[in-house]
Swiss-Prot record:
Protein name: Ubiquinone biosynthesis O-methyltransferase
Family: Belongs to the methyltransferase superfamily. UbiG/COQ3 family.
Gene behind this protein: ubiG
Gene Ontology molecular-function annotations: 2-polyprenyl-6-hydroxyphenol methylase activity; 3-demethylubiquinol 3-O-methyltransferase activity; polyprenyldihydroxybenzoate methyltransferase activity
Binding site for S-adenosyl-L-methionine: 45, 76, 97, 141
PANTHER family cross-referenced by the UniProt entry: METHYLTRANSFERASE, UBIQUINONE BIOSYNTHESIS O-METHYLTRANSFERASE, MITOCHONDRIAL
Source species of the chain: Caulobacter vibrioides (strain NA1000 / CB15N) (Caulobacter crescentus)
Gene3D superfamilies: Vaccinia Virus protein VP39
Domain of life, source organism: Bacteria
Length: 252
């Protein structure tokens, strides 16, 4: 959930958010712990990534590892909740995060699962400066609302995307509905996530994301809304983009 940190370039990093997620790093793989909402959300976002990537790369969804031969960068990987299923789908996964504690948790769990994932504590800026990539797929899921400079962060992520590739961005919309439900409701009423997890002022409107990338050689698609059904306890795609939404970015 947070991006990476080190002595390397890290101007988009918010140290307070890094510390907040580091403090609960051991709970990433506990489906009933502090990251329980992400475990519930994961099937919806995984299905979206898989569907869009199959179409983008013209791959056979019935194959055991349909994305074999493709590279993927998971920025702000947290404990690896997305990195692991992406590796199982055949991607060669590089995963970075701001918190060394998150990376240690993720690497330990991947080793227990017999998965080869390139985890490292590093920033997107650091990877770009090193000349890493570019990657066929870049994930920045529920990350951009936690960084200090979202515009610079998103442009850096786009530069790490290979021509012909696709980037996924998931975040929260800065609406009164999101303030009431995703901030006050989720943190202080339902206690789904620890208080202080989000700052409503850092939520982003879809048009702001488009503006961030206006000068880049990319195209942005979406928003694609996602909504939670309290009766079923599941997330699904929705026409409602007032709270949670995803965008895709393609480079041709």
């Amino acid at each position: 959930m947070t991006q990476a940190a080190s002595a390397a370039p890290s101007w988009s990093i918010d140290p307070a958010d890094v510390a907040r997620f580091s403090a609960i790093a051991a709970e990433w793989w506990d489906p009933k712990g502090k990251f329980a909402p992400l475990h519930v959300f994961n099937p919806c976002r995984l299905a979206f990534i898989r569907e869009q990537a199959l179409a983008r790369f013209d791959r056979d969804g019935a194959a055991r590892a349909p994305f074999e031969g493709l590279t993927l960068l998971d920025i702000g990987c947290g404990g690896g909740l997305l990195s692991e299923p992406m590796a199982r789908l055949g991607f060669a996964v590089t995963a970075i995060d701001a918190s060394e504690k998150n990376i240690k948790t993720a690497a330990t769990h991947a080793a227990e699962q017999g998965l080869d994932i390139g985890y490292r504590p590093a920033t997107a800026e650091q990877l770009l400066a090193e000349g890493a990539g570019p990657f066929d797929v870049v994930l920045t899921m529920e990350v951009i609302e936690h960084v200090a400079d979202p515009g610079e962060f998103l442009r850096t992520c786009a530069k790490l995307l290979k021509p012909g590739g696709i980037m996924f961005v998931a975040t929260l919309n800065r609406t009164l509905k999101a303030l009431a439900l995703a901030k006050i409701g989720a943190e202080y009423v339902l206690r789904w996530v620890p208080p202080g997890t989000h700052d409503w002022k850092q939520f982003l409107k879809p048009e702001e994301l488009r503006a961030f990338l206006a000068g880049e050689p990319v195209a942005m698609q979406g928003p694609f809304g996602v909504a939670y059904n309290p009766l079923t306890g599941r997330w699904s795609r929705s026409s409602d983009t007032d709270i949670n939404y995803m965008m895709t970015v393609t480079k041709d």
